[in-house]
């Protein structure tokens, strides 16, 4: 025997917590000609042995020794194994490792993926978080066993593809903390064992499935999360605190920029990322620790759309599918968000409104249609809240401070959702209150939908105030829960989205520090050093997520301008990033997508079947059925479909008189689309897109905003919400049902050193305390005389604006009769 187990460093990373002492964190892999032997040990000095068969390498055959050995007993056992295999070379040390990533099979034998080097990147409540520094792939089949050479070429190509998933970049894990879940869920909903591997943020769920099935535990594997993790220690008013920023990328509908767009039939969107911001006191282990977290979400626009990868176009045309007429997949997506985060779901949509050639604006109009259609079937308190806000337009307006405006939106969203606050006592930390248990049996069959989507109400009931576990003479503050989430998107959910997510994190940080008693005020000014530090973290996170999905760092024009960076240097940097993103999307993403599909088990190689590189089926798989390409030469008949329920549709039947859907409503108020008859759609987009010029869809007509029809209306009635607030500008760049646009736009001349505060002209009530969204926004008219006079000139001298629209609404007299007829009866407008 050339080596024997040694544990001089076996206790690395352990602490006094019983949970940390119980989990195995270091392993040694030995081999004979017939078997692999993996030895694992924990901080308590308990040794275990896993035996892996090598003779039948086409089948995964694992056996765990149920005996718990001491160090001496384990050494003696290995010595006997060595003596019994001397004739074939004995027992040899292969490698020291830190956990099994999983097992995978292509066309030949199984391979074992191991973590061979790790690096500590942070800790949460005493639980250490690591990133993968080095990994290795080892064939189970011994080299002396004959292999099938017919498939050797394809086998090697599959191995090269898998290696394209670089496990040393942005993969992190913890042995004792459920890093795949938010802090709130870890406190309130105690899940453990194999069920945690089925969560949507565990990227090696498929690779570990066989191990969990055979062993009924997760002692030997680690759950890898893909995304971003960064922790830093900061000081404020002489008190230290830890700021942790985590991004968890979903494994569902995962892939690259142009090959994964929109939504799939299961309601999973591309580029779905959960971002968590944790603030915790930096205190000794024997003192109670206050901790706060807030979660937000980003994800592709939940419609069936795609873009054709092109080597000739930097910005390919958008393809919008017509197959989901009742927005069933979109409804399922938002239903899943409600189950994961509770209500309200707040949508911040940042895509463009005005374009010479309609691209983003097509999706903006259709997304508005989908939200309105879904909201019709929801109880008032569960309806989707939204703000359509053209960030590109507002950024190029020299009178506006984009970060300050987004900060005001974030403050409004925070008042609706709240954030999580908890106080951990020393006993809870020492006993591993949030620990990951690896001994629970994983006996349930695999279900791809078995994700972190439990009913939020049950989670809330399970979360007990920390006073129930308090001990000693400590004053324990009451806990807080976050209910609901802010969901942000642009087209790629990278550049503009990251700016908005920083604004939300900035607004939340002040609230979190105030809750911890570190700051007296719940706000932080933009020029505060804390804001700059936080901006650096979000900028780094944005670059990381952009590399993963888009192939280059993020476009950070807003951040660069905020830092006062030389504009010419910024433009040069942005141009280079555009070229890098274009090259990767056009030339590299196909292989990268194949690699991701193999790693996640989306594609499984089989002998006699087509290879993954022969299919290339991911290209626009979300938009094949019934897709309509937005080419320049195609022209469509434009219909005007307004959102008012009394406007007639093509059959001349008032929509309000049509038979309503089934009254049965699910526990969250979401109704399945097969129970619904689609009655109307809304449309809003760029006013400068001609009806017979640029192409559009009849379902998402780029038409004039409602202010063109009914004068300068600021508040209109929708079927999906009690009140919709529009911008005074005629480009419809801002539309919302939870933020008053007039109040928001009153900040156009906001000074950069203005800070977030609870707006005096805005009162937001919790969704649990309101029965109508009318009550969400009040007192919005407390404006200065100058602001009242700053509206459009056409508004002066007119009658007071009505807040509800109906067929009796007076249409402006300067429109021709044919146009009035079209508005009143919903017919197609032809020239």
Swiss-Prot record:
PROSITE patterns: SAC. A motif (Phosphatase catalytic core) lies at residues 487-498. Residues 162-551 form the SAC domain. Its cofactor is Mg(2+). Keywords: Hydrolase, Membrane, Vacuole. The PI(3,5)P2 regulatory complex regulates both the synthesis and turnover of phosphatidylinositol 3,5-bisphosphate (PtdIns(3,5)P2). This is Phosphoinositide phosphatase SAC4. The lineage of its organism: Eukaryota, Viridiplantae, Streptophyta, Embryophyta, Tracheophyta. The gene is SAC4.
């Amino acid at each position: 025997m050339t080596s024997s187990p040694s544990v001089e460093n076996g206790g690395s990373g352990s602490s006094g917590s019983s949970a940390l002492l119980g989990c195995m964190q270091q392993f040694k892999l030995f081999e004979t000609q017939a078997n692999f032997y993996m030895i694992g040990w924990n901080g308590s000095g308990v040794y275990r042995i896993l035996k892996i068969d090598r003779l039948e390498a086409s089948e995964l055959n694992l056996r765990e020794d149920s005996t718990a050995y001491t160090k001496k007993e384990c050494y003696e056992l290995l010595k006997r194994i060595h003596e019994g295999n001397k004739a074939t070379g004995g027992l040899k040390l292969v490698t020291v490792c830190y956990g099994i990533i999983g097992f995978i099979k292509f066309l030949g034998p199984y391979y074992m993926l191991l973590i061979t080097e790790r690096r500590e990147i942070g800790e949460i409540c005493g639980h250490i978080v690591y990133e993968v520094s080095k990994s290795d792939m080892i064939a189970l089949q011994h080299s002396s066993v004959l292999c099938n050479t017919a498939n050797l070429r394809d086998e090697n190509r599959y191995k090269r593809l898998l290696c394209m998933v670089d496990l040393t970049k942005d993969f992190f894990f913890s042995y004792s903390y459920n890093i795949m879940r938010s802090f709130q869920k870890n406190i309130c909903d105690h899940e453990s064992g194999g069920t945690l591997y089925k969560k949507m943020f565990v990227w090696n769920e498929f690779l570990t499935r066989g191990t969990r099935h055979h062993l009924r535990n997760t002692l030997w594997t680690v759950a890898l999360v893909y995304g971003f993790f960064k922790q830093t220690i900061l000081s404020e008013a002489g008190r230290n605190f830890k700021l942790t920023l985590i991004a968890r990328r979903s494994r569902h509908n995962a892939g690259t920029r142009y090959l994964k767009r929109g939504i799939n039939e299961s309601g999973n969107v591309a580029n779905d990322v959960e971002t968590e911001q944790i603030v915790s006191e930096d205190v000794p282990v024997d003192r109670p620790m206050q901790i706060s977290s807030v979660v937000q979400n980003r994800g592709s626009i939940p419609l069936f759309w795609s873009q054709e990868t092109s080597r000739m176009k930097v910005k390919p045309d958008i393809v919008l599918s017509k197959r989901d007429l009742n927005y069933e997949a979109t409804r399922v997506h938002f239903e899943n968000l409600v189950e994961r985060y509770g209500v309200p779901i707040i949508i911040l949509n940042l895509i463009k409104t005005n374009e010479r050639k309609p691209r983003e604006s097509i999706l903006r109009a259709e997304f508005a249609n989908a939200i309105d259609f879904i909201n019709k079937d929801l109880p008032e308190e569960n309806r989707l809240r939204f703000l359509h806000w053209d960030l590109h337009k507002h950024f190029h307006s020299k009178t506006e401070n984009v970060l300050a405006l987004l900060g005001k939106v974030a403050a409004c969203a925070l008042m609706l959702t709240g954030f999580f606050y908890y106080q951990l006592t020393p006993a809870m930390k020492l006993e591993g209150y949030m620990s990951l248990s690896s001994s629970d049996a994983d006996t349930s069959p695999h279900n791809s939908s078995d994700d972190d989507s439990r009913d939020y109400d049950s989670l809330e009931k399970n979360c007990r105030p920390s006073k129930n576990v308090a001990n000693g003479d400590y004053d324990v503050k009451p806990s807080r829960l976050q209910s609901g989430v802010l969901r942000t998107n642009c087209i790629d959910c990278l550049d503009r989205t990251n700016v908005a997510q920083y604004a939300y994190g900035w607004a939340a940080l002040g609230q979190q520090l105030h809750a911890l008693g570190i700051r007296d005020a719940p706000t932080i000014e933009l020029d505060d050093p804390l804001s700059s530090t936080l901006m650096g973290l979000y900028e780094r996170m944005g670059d990381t997520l952009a590399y993963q999905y888009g192939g280059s760092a993020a476009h950070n024009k807003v951040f660069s301008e905020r830092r006062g960076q030389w504009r010419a240097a910024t433009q040069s940097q942005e141009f280079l990033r555009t070229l890098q993103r274009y090259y990767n999307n056009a030339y590299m993403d196909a292989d990268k997508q194949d690699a991701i599909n193999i790693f996640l088990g989306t594609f499984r190689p089989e002998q006699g079947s087509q290879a993954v590189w022969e299919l290339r089926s991911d290209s626009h798989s979300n938009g094949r059925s019934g897709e309509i390409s937005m080419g320049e030469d195609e022209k469509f008949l434009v219909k005007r479909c307004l959102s008012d329920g009394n406007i007639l549709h093509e059959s001349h039947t008032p929509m309000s008189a049509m038979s309503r859907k089934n009254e049965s409503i699910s526990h969250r108020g979401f109704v399945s689309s097969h129970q619904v008859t689609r009655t109307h759609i809304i449309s809003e987009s760029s006013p400068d897109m001609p009806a017979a010029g640029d192409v559009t869809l009849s379902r998402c007509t780029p038409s004039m905003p409602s202010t063109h029809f009914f004068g300068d209306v600021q508040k209109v009635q929708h079927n999906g919400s009690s009140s919709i607030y529009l911008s005074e500008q005629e480009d419809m760049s801002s539309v919302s049902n939870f933020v008053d646009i007039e109040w928001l736009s009153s900040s156009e001349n906001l000074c950069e050193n203005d800070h977030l505060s609870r707006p005096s002209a805005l009162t937001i009530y919790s969704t649990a305390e309101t029965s109508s969204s009318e009550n969400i926004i009040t007192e919005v008219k407390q404006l200065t005389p100058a602001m009242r006079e700053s509206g459009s000139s056409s508004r002066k001298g007119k009658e007071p604006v009505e807040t509800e629209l109906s067929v009796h609404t007076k249409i402006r007299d300067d429109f021709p009769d044919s146009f009035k007829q079209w508005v009143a009866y919903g017919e197609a407008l032809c020239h």
